[in-house]
């Protein structure tokens, strides 16, 4: 999908410098993928411990002798 965006030149230059990626479309795609990954992880972490019915997973190891 083609989209026109206005991006801060300094921000784009800093991202290119840090990543080594010079192509603007690649920088934007990588940035969006990272944003989705970070937000997904944040939401998953926010769910931690919210299932009152959860039980401990069974362990496969036998007890040490």
From Swiss-Prot:
Residues 46-65 are annotated as: Disordered. Keywords: Secreted, Toxin-antitoxin system. It is found in: Secreted. Coiled coil: none annotated. GO terms for cellular component: extracellular region. One of its GO terms (biological process) is positive regulation of growth. This is Antitoxin VapB32. It comes from Mycobacterium tuberculosis (strain ATCC 25618 / H37Rv). The gene is vapB32.
């Amino acid at each position: 999908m083609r989209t026109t965006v206005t991006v801060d030149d300094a921000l784009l230059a800093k991202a290119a410098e840090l990543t080594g990626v010079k192509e603007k479309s690649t920088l934007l795609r990588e940035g969006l993928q990272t944003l989705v990954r970070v937000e997904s992880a944040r939401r998953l972490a926010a769910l931690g411990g919210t299932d009152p019915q959860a039980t401990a997973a069974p362990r496969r190891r036998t007890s040490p002798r």
